[in-house]
Amino acid sequence: MKVLFAVNNEKVSTAIIKKYQMMYKEIISCKNVYFFNAIIKELQKDKSYDRIVIGEDLEPYANNNYEVIDNFLFDKLDSISDEASNSRDGDIPIILIGADRREKGSAILVKLFGIGIYNVLLGQDRSIENVCKLIAQPRTKKEAKAYYRIEAEDVDYQLVDPDSVSETEIQNIIKH
């Protein structure tokens, strides 16, 4: 099992690997990256990953407006999901460890579901053991719909123009 970790603390990925190897008696080879753009670059270089584990708090946000943060996060995850396909099985499951404030049924979960991210951990479910379970057995679309508590008619499956730059991205570039 080859996993790309994008969490803000290497101790987290080490703990996940140790727990997974204890639970499933399977070795994990991994790489740690520390920026959203580094995930994309790594996936462009190496298509052999089996799973991607991302901490929502990977990077500090230049803004404390939740809507702006959600748009930034969605744009990054959309770009990552576009690159997340491996040479063997197609799409690489993305496991997102959500922030404290995330709740089931929220608009961001509907958007993430729409781009095929079915493995977000929320609230009390954000544990090393649950990350290990999702690495071993990612959720199906049906399981994700039930876990996220969303209705099919809420989901907007839309293609995003890869050449367009969102207003949020422009503002973050200007601030930086």
Residues covered by each model-derived region:
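Long, basic/Gly/Ser/Thr-rich N-terminal segments
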Residues: 1-173
